[in-house]
Amino acid sequence: MNLIEFPSLDQTMPNSVISTTLNDLSNWSRLSSLWPLLYGTSCCFIEFAALIGSRFDFDRYGLVPRSSPRQADLILTAGTVTMKMAPSLVRLYEQMPEPKYVIAMGACTITGGMFSTDSYSTVRGVDKLIPVDVYLPGCPPKPEAVIDAITKLRKKISREIYEDRIGSKQENRCFTINHKFHVQRSIHTGNYNKELLYQSPSTSEITSEEFFRSKSSISSHKLVN
């Protein structure tokens, strides 16, 4: 907490009294009581689950896992985010009260990971859907790295001005079709545009004749490139 010195008050008040601004007091209280909403969809979440044990004891940072987004101010995305899960993730973020923060944990969350090059259903970066405060790369990151990310987020909160945080709030969200992103309005109502969330048919829904016909139409030159 940033302290402010008042010479006239220091002469009459005991040393146990701390003088500061309301903004710094608010930041200090929030960074010491972050309540994360755990959003784990893949193996990265297993590393985060290790923090709950006695070896790392993340309770010392004031972290209290919550199962409801309305009681959380931090969402930690760990694992692959598919286009089918994209509206659910955005809705969870919209339901969290301000101010709220996001930690993107793992390569799959940040860039799509190994699914980003040849996958029709993976979002290439969770920051296309929600604003991210701290990026935590790794496959998967170690629990010590998660603690370091939480420490960096706490430092960011301690220097934060509340008015600037509200002013820079993201108003638009991005949805993807075949990795082409389209900006849409905020979806507080929960009414999603189903056209933007169209999923390509799986191979089980395609007949064998159509499958081999599409394969035969691709030249060997395209396959090499």
UniProtKB/Swiss-Prot annotation:
- Cite the entry's keywords alphabetically: 4Fe-4S, Chloroplast, Iron, Iron-sulfur, Membrane, Metal-binding, NAD, NADP, Plastid, Plastoquinone, Quinone, Thylakoid, Translocase, Transport
Annotated cofactor note = Binds 1 [4Fe-4S] cluster.
Q: In which residues is [4Fe-4S] cluster bound?
A: 43-44, 108, 139
Q: Which GO terms describe its molecular function?
A: 4 iron, 4 sulfur cluster binding; iron ion binding; NADH dehydrogenase (ubiquinone) activity; quinone binding
Pfam families assigned to the protein according to its UniProt record, in alphabetical order: Oxidored_q6
Query: What does the record give as cofactor?
Result: [4Fe-4S] cluster
Topology term for the membrane? Peripheral membrane protein
What catalytic activity is recorded? a plastoquinone + NADH + (n+1) H(+)(in) = a plastoquinol + NAD(+) + n H(+)(out); a plastoquinone + NADPH + (n+1) H(+)(in) = a plastoquinol + NADP(+) + n H(+)(out)
Q: What is its EC number?
A: 7.1.1.-
Sorted alphabetically, the Gene Ontology cellular component annotations on this record are: chloroplast thylakoid membrane; respiratory chain complex I
Question: Where is the protein found, in the record's own terms?
Answer: Plastid, Chloroplast thylakoid membrane
Major location, coarse class? plastid
Subunit info here reads:
NDH is composed of at least 16 different subunits, 5 of which are encoded in the nucleus.
The role this protein plays is: NDH shuttles electrons from NAD(P)H:plastoquinone, via FMN and iron-sulfur (Fe-S) centers, to quinones in the photosynthetic chain and possibly in a chloroplast respiratory chain. The immediate electron acceptor for the enzyme in this species is believed to be plastoquinone. Couples the redox reaction to proton translocation, and thus conserves the redox energy in a proton gradient.
Q: What is this protein called?
A: NAD(P)H-quinone oxidoreductase subunit K, chloroplastic
Q: Which organism is it from?
A: Lemna minor (Common duckweed)
Upper lineage ranks? Answer: Eukaryota, Viridiplantae, Streptophyta, Embryophyta, Tracheophyta
